[in-house]
């Protein structure tokens, strides 16, 4: 057979396809990143040839990264056994498990992370905004952005909603709820901050008004008595003002795996004596 002749597979002429471009992951699998346009017929043929090679090599999980420009390959990939794993604005990630043993591919992210910011000034007044159309005065809240620190998110949310600059002091408490956002769980961190400016410039999109409110007045809102979370937050703040409660302070660290900066939040007994304003 010459180099130009196609080989036979089960008596049928079989065209040779190059294996899809891939790199090994750290867990015995492969990551396929499609960058060159490909029609569905050639993709399926190349994918099947790739599977043959990966099985011989003992590969396990296959991660298929399809950018928006390769949306035509989603349906054929699913028909070949891939399932969705997660999506980002510019790509869809699909996965396939080769061995007959149970899959060990990790699930997609399970939680959304949010913050609430308690800002107390020297007059023991809290910073509140009135939620549009609700008549409820609330502390600044929001979602932590990808790659953003918890304390930085709290500072940002206060600035965005009220125009107030703040300094992070500690995490007072956090709670977990389930099926909160598209069936995902929710982690909510209540942060204590100290104001460094006082000129309120409210955000018009989400809140109707913003003001400094006496701690006693905020605690007397009907919603505070009806909602366990609000009630507990006020109770914790009250204990903090009495110096009988210590939250979690941040400590910069580097991880075991790399030298990237992270933060450990820990409870230090001496924090109970730290003034909040």
From Swiss-Prot:
Top-level taxon of origin: Eukaryota
Family: Belongs to the Nudix hydrolase family.
Name of a matching Pfam family: Nudix_hydro
Enzyme class: hydrolase
Tissues with expression: Expressed in roots, stems and, at lower level, leaves.
CDD domains xref list: NUDIX_ASFGF2_Nudt6
Any one GO CC term of the record: cytosol
Signal peptide stretch: none
Annotated protein name in UniProt: Nudix hydrolase 10
Family annotation (InterPro entries): NUDIX_hydrolase-like_dom_sf, Nudix_hydrolase6-like, NUDIX_hydrolase_CS, NUDIX_hydrolase_dom, Pre-Nudix
Domain Nudix hydrolase: 97-235
The reaction(s) this protein catalyses: ADP-D-ribose + H2O = D-ribose 5-phosphate + AMP + 2 H(+); NAD(+) + H2O = beta-nicotinamide D-ribonucleotide + AMP + 2 H(+); NADH + H2O = reduced beta-nicotinamide D-ribonucleotide + AMP + 2 H(+)
Cofactor(s) this protein requires: Mg(2+); Mn(2+)
Record's keyword annotation contains tRNA processing: no
Keyword DNA repair: no
Organism: Arabidopsis thaliana
Function: May mediate the hydrolysis of some nucleoside diphosphate derivatives. In vitro, uses both ADP-ribose and NADH as substrates; however the relevance of such substrates in vivo is unclear.
GO molecular function term, any single one: metal ion binding
Binding residues for Mg(2+): 157, 161
UniProt keywords, alphabetically: Hydrolase, Magnesium, Manganese, Metal-binding, NAD
EC number assigned by the record: 3.6.1.-, 3.6.1.13, 3.6.1.22
């Amino acid at each position: 057979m010459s180099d130009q002749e196609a080989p036979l597979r089960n008596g049928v002429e079989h065209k040779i396809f190059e294996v899809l471009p891939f790199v090994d992951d750290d867990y015995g699998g492969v990551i396929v990143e499609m960058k060159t346009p490909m029609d569905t017929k050639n993709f399926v043929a190349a994918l099947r040839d790739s599977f043959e090679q990966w099985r011989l090599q003992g590969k396990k999980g296959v991660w298929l990264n399809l950018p928006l420009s390769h949306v035509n390959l989603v349906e054929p990939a699913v028909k070949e056994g891939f399932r969705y794993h997660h999506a980002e604005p510019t790509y869809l990630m699909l996965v396939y498990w080769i061995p007959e043993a149970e899959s060990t591919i990790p699930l997609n992210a399970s939680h959304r992370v949010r913050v609430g910011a308690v800002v107390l000034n020297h007059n023991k007044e809290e910073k509140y905004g009135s939620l549009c159309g609700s008549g409820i005065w609330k502390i600044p809240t929001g979602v932590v952005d990808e790659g953003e620190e918890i304390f930085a998110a709290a500072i940002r949310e206060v600035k965005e909603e009220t125009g107030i600059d703040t300094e992070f002091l500690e995490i007072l408490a956090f709670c977990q709820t389930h099926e909160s956002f598209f069936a995902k769980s929710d982690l909510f961190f209540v942060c204590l901050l100290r104001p460094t400016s006082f000129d309120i410039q409210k955000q018009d999109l989400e809140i109707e008004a913003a003001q400094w409110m006496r701690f006693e007045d905020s605690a007397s809102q009907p919603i505070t008595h009806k909602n366990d979370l609000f009630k507990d937050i006020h109770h914790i703040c009250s204990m903090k003002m009495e110096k009988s409660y210590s939250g979690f302070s941040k400590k910069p660290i580097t991880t075991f795996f790399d030298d990237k900066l992270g933060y450990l939040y820990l409870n230090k007994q001496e924090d109970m004596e730290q003034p909040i304003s």
